[in-house]
Amino acid sequence: MLDPRARTLLKTLIERYIADGQPVGSRTLSRYSGLELSPATIRNVMSDLEELGLVSSPHTSAGRVPTPRGYRLFVDTMLTVETPIDAEAVARQVQHTLQAGEPQQRVVAAAASVLSNLSQFAGVVLTPRRSHVFKQIEFMRLSDKRILLIIVTPEGDVQNRMLATPRDYSPSQLTEASNYINAHFAGLSFDEVRRRLRDEIDQLRGDMTTLMHAAVTASTEVPDTEDTVLISGERNLLEVADLSSDMARLRKLFDVFDQKTGLLQLLDVSSHAQGVQIFIGGESTLVPIEEMSVVTAPYEVNGQIVGTLGVIGPTRMAYNRVIPIVDITARLLSLTLSQQ
C-alpha cells in the first residue's frame, strides 16, 4: 500500500505525535526520520498520506496528526512490541498485588487497579463467568426439614442454598447423599446431574432420590450472576490533554463507563480471541469514541478462558508499552487464579 519512504515518514510521524502530542511538521520529520528528503518532498508525501486517510491536518497547525486508520496501519505493520526495560518490575508489581489465596473477586479487582497504575489510563476487567458445574457439595442439617446446601465451584466460589424438604434427614444420611453426589457427579453441570439421576433412580433409595432432586432443583433455579465489568483509574483520563480539553468528549466517555453495556460486549468479544486485541478509535461500534483505544487480552483458569482485561486510553497511547502491560497482567492473573 505504501512505499518504504512513505511508511518511514508515517511511522516517524506517529511516534513523534505519541511522544509530544503536537502536530508534526516537515522539519520534525526530516530530523527524526533519518531520510535525506527536502521539505517539499516530505510535504508531498504527507499530502498523499492525507488523501489515503492516514493523517489529517488540524486547522490551527501546519503539521499533521495520525487518524485512527493511520494508527491501525501502524499497530498492524510497523509497531515493534519489545519486552519493556522494566518488565521484571512490572511483573513483580503484578505478582505482589495479585496474591494467591485471596478471594477471587478481590484478585480480579486488584488486576484492574494494577492495569490502571502501570498504564496511567483506565484499567478494566470482565470478571469470571459463574461456573455451571460444581466441584463439591455438602448438606448441613439446620432444623427439622431445613437443610443448607453448600456448593463449591471449580473456581473456588462457595454458594449457599436453603432447602425445604418433605421429611427430616439425619446427619449421617446427609453425609451419605453428599458423598454419593461428589463421587459420581463432581465436575458435571447440574442439568447433567439431573439427567443421570433419572437413569440411576432404580439404584437409589427413595429418600436419597428426593434429597438429591431437591438439591439439583435449588441449584438450577437460582439465576446466574450477570457478567460484571470492573473499572479502575477513570480519573487518570482527566489528565490526558487530548481529552480533558473537550467536556463533550469526556461526558461521552464517562457515559460508556457508567452504562458499561458496550464495554461489556467488547470485552466479551475479546474473550473469544487468542492473545492481545487492539481496538482503535471508532473501530468498535461498541465503544464508539474516535479518540479512544482499548487494548485487551483474555485470562484463564486452568487453561479455560473465563474473562478479559484491558486498558482504555487515548488513541495517542504508547502501544509498545501498554501491550506488554496488558499481556503480562493477563498471564499472571491466569496463574494466580489457577493456583487458588
From Swiss-Prot:
One of its GO terms (biological process) is negative regulation of DNA-templated transcription. Pfam families: HrcA, HrcA_DNA-bdg. InterPro entries: GAF-like_dom_sf, HrcA, HrcA_C, WH-like_DNA-bd_sf, WH_DNA-bd_sf, WHTH_HrcA_DNA-bd, WHTH_transcript_rep_HrcA_IDD. Signal peptide: none annotated. Keywords: Repressor, Stress response, Transcription, Transcription regulation. GO terms for molecular function: DNA binding. SUPFAM superfamilies: GAF domain-like, Winged helix' DNA-binding domain. Transmembrane segments: none annotated. Belongs to the HrcA family. Negative regulator of class I heat shock genes (grpE-dnaK-dnaJ and groELS operons). Prevents heat-shock induction of these operons. NCBIfam families: hrcA (TIGR00331). This is Heat-inducible transcription repressor HrcA. The gene is hrcA.
